[in-house]
Swiss-Prot record:
Binding-site residues for ATP, renumbered to this chain: 93-103
NCBIfam families in UniProt: ispE (TIGR00154), PRK14608.1 (NF011202)
Reaction catalyzed: 4-CDP-2-C-methyl-D-erythritol + ATP = 4-CDP-2-C-methyl-D-erythritol 2-phosphate + ADP + H(+)
UniProt family annotation: Belongs to the GHMP kinase family. IspE subfamily.
Species name: Thermoanaerobacter pseudethanolicus (strain ATCC 33223 / 39E)
Protein name listed in UniProt: 4-diphosphocytidyl-2-C-methyl-D-erythritol kinase
InterPro entries associated with the record: GHMP_kinase_C_dom, GHMP_kinase_C_sf, GHMP_kinase_N_dom, IspE, Ribosomal_Su5_D2-typ_SF, Ribsml_uS5_D2-typ_fold_subgr
Gene: ispE
Length: 289
């Protein structure tokens, strides 16, 4: 096998409770992570050198890039001499709260396992994933998961398919900055995860939409009023409920009426540079060989 293509799917958070800061600097959370059908496309090809190409010039391709981090970790762990050429077709917006970088890292773990014949176990993949970032273990599996710890302890959930509209304003958010501000201002959690889990188990889209909340929204919307403006617009246009994903700034709305969703899409794409009509899916990655 010389070449592998992977679709790396984005995620949203249907809830995000921040429960405290750990000694290692990470935050203890309780969150429901959900894969959606927005995806980056990555192509991996055997080579003597390591080189990453991307269609978006804003993506940094140095040692801090998560794809590069995974390549270096795997080369070191398995004493690999050969390299890889990676072509990244970036479709998930940057610094958006949608785990685009984490999805690309997960795709790299799975692709190189096959391309380099590493025969990694599920645990070995997860171990590498955790070294790279807190969302990467989820992106390896995808679907709908209740995640605890720093986001690496999972419980599978089964969700009714939902139609979504994603809107990202023209701002980029630093996750670290948002968590630091959360700590400084001593915010208290909404504890939204339990009611959303119950609604998912009941298969009740209306209850899910009614209960979605994200603690980090308190911080991000305080600095960027546009978050609340987008939420108001989505609700006015027929969303059953809406929330920010991750540390933001992407906001999503859940719709049960496709006509209203299409109309909202047409209206909002005139105002915002990134508006995406999406749906929930049950996987994090898709491989093409």
């Amino acid at each position: 096998m010389k070449k592998i293509k992977v679709k790396a799917y984005a995620k949203i958070n249907l809830s995000l409770d921040v429960l405290g800061k750990r000694e290692d600097g990470y935050h203890e959370i309780s969150t429901i992570m959900q894969s959606i059908d927005l995806a980056d496309i990555l192509e991996f090809e055997k080579s003597e050198i390591v080189k990453v190409f991307c269609n978006d010039h804003r993506v940094p391709l140095g040692e801090d890039n998560l794809i590069v981090k995974v390549i270096n970790l795997l080369k070191e762990k398995y004493q690999m001499e050969e390299g890889v050429l990676v072509k990244l077709d970036k479709r998930i917006p940057l610094a958006a709260g949608l785990a685009g970088g984490s999805a690309d890292a997960a795709a790299t773990i799975v692709a190189l396992d096959k391309l380099w014949n590493l025969n990694m176990s599920k645990e070995e993949k997860k171990e590498i994933a955790l070294k790279v970032g807190a969302d990467v273990p989820f992106c390896l599996e995808g679907g709908t998961k209740l995640a605890k710890g720093i986001g690496e302890i999972f419980e599978d959930l089964k969700i009714t398919s939902m139609n979504l509209l994603l809107v990202k304003p023209d701002i980029e958010i630093s996750t670290k900055e948002i968590y630091d501000k959360w700590d400084r201002l001593n915010f208290k959690s909404h504890h939204a995860t339990v009611p959303v889990v119950q609604a998912i188990q009941e298969g009740n889209i209306y209850k899910i939409a009614e209960n979605i909340k994200n603690d980090l929204e308190l911080v991000t919307s305080q600095k960027y009023g546009i978050i609340n403006k987008i939420k108001e617009e989505l609700l006015k246009k027929g969303a059953l409920g809406c929330a920010m994903s991750g540390s933001g700034p992407t906001v999503y709305g859940i719709f049960d009426d496709l006509e209203k969703l299409r109309k909202a899409y047409e209206d909002l794409k005139e105002v915002y540079s990134f508006v995406f009509f999406s749906k929930t899916i049950d996987k994090g990655l898709e491989l093409y060989e």
